[in-house]
Each structure stands twice: as C-alpha cells, then as structure tokens.
Design a protein with these regions (language model features):
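Bacterial N-terminal signal peptides that target proteins for export
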Residues: 1-7
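C-terminal motif of bacterial Sec signal peptides marking the signal peptidase cleavage site
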Residues: 14-17
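Intrinsically disordered, low-complexity proline/glycine-rich segments
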Residues: 19-243
Length: 243
C-alpha cells in the first residue's frame, strides 16, 4: 500500500512541477470554476467558501441536538463533520457527514442505502434543506478510489424522488493515459447521466455547479462537494473488498 502511495505522489509531484494540475472535466459540463477558500490551514473555526457558496464554522464530532434518524444509527463512526451550507437564493442546508464506520455498522450502512457492494470504506451523510426543502441522504463508497482502478469510487445523493450520481474523476490534463489510472483527483455529479457539477480535491480545491439547476439542487451538490473537500485523508482505512 505504501509503495503504491509513493508512486502516486511522485507522479503527481512531477506533474505539479510543470504546471498547476487541472482535472479532465466532461466537456458537456456547463459551469465556471469556483476556487475554494478555507480548505487549508487551521481546522478551528474553519469556513469553506467558493463562488456564491459558503458554510458556517465546521464542527468535527457531534455536538448535542442531533436527532436525525440517519445520524442516530451510526454513533460509533470515528470521523464526523457537521456544518450549514449556504447557497443561492438564500438557500440553507444542515449537513452531517460520517466516515470510518465501526465494523459492526457496515451492514447497517448497506441496509440503509440498499447497497450490495461489499466495500468497507464509506463516506455518507444527511442534508436537510431549510424552509420546507427535501431531506437528502448521500453515500460514496471507496472515496479515495484505489491504485490502478482496483476498486471503483462511486455513489449517489437521493431524496426519495430524485437521485444524483457521484462518479470518480481520475484524469489530469497533460497526463499520459497510464497515469490516469493512479488515483482519484475529484468527483463529478450527474443527473440522468448529464454532468451537472464537479469537485476537485487537488491542492486548495475547485468546485463547478451548473447554474441552470434549481437553488435547492445546487445547494445539495455544494454540500456534498464541501464534505468531500473537508474529509480527512483516509489512506489508513482498510479499503479492501470483503471476500
């Protein structure tokens, strides 16, 4: 595992030495790049901003007052984030993210989302949109991807009526094809197979969201993009598929 990480880092370092790395985005995505502010630096009082989107101060670990059924199911998770995501047209969503689940909770995760894949590594959460908006859940399995595409990274956001697919982005501009197999550099969001957003987790981060979407959908995509930007490095988590 460490050897694979070293190769990936050396490859990325070589690319960065030449120019700032950029994701290979689907050309059908109609959205401008929004550079992220606040990702690097102290975690105390951390606020994430990009474009018209911002959060309040990010909270790590649960405080009191969380009675969302999704959250109550997974109290043993080691990594927990919560924040308010503010979006266009004064839209606000309350967001709770969980990862590093206890082994005893993995089956609960699969049952909750109806997932048949036997991955051990999940990043999941709940998004509650204020002022009569919908309640959304999201899950991403194997969020780091893996070396040479040994295991996929994919997931979805859903509210009971609508589902937004999440797919990994592996390529960087200027990379030879073999290097595009190395690791995940971000994720894209799809509705009915059309790309409507993306997030780059390289360096400070960048987000793209199609402005033609309604305010709630844009804010929900932003909430998951922010969660992915905040998610700590999980290379130490066992990402092996159960046999």
């Amino acid at each position: 595992m460490h050897f694979k990480i070293v190769i990936s880092l050396l490859a990325l370092t070589g690319l960065v030495a030449c120019h700032t790395p950029e994701l290979v985005l689907d050309p059908s995505l109609s959205a401008g790049a929004m550079p992220v502010k606040g990702r690097n630096g102290l975690q105390i009082g951390q606020v994430i901003r990009y474009g018209d989107y911002t959060t309040d101060k990010v909270r790590r670990g649960w405080t009191k007052g969380y009675d969302i059924p999704f959250i109550l199911r997974f109290q043993g998770a080691k990594e927990k984030l919560s924040f308010a995501q503010f979006g266009p047209e004064n839209t606000k969503a309350t967001v709770a993210c969980i990862s590093k689940f206890k082994s005893t909770e993995i089956e609960l995760v699969r049952d909750f989302f109806g997932i048949q894949l036997d991955y051990q590594n999940y990043f999941a959460g709940n998004i509650t949109v204020d002022q009569g908006g919908a309640n959304w859940d999201f899950i991403l399995h194997n969020p780091n991807g893996d070396f040479l595409r040994e295991k996929a990274s994919a997931g979805f956001i859903r509210n009971g009526e609508q589902q937004i697919a999440i797919e990994a982005i592996r390529g960087l501009k200027g990379q030879p094809d073999w290097m595009k197999e190395l690791t995940v550099y971000g994720h894209e969001f799809r509705i009915d197979n059309a790309v409507v957003g993306a997030v780059s987790t390289i360096n400070k981060g960048t987000v793209w969201i199609d402005e033609r979407l309604d305010a709630e959908t844009r804010t929900v995509i932003a909430a998951v993009a922010t969660g992915l930007l905040l998610r700590r490095d999980m290379e130490d988590v066992d990402m092996q598929v159960t046999r």
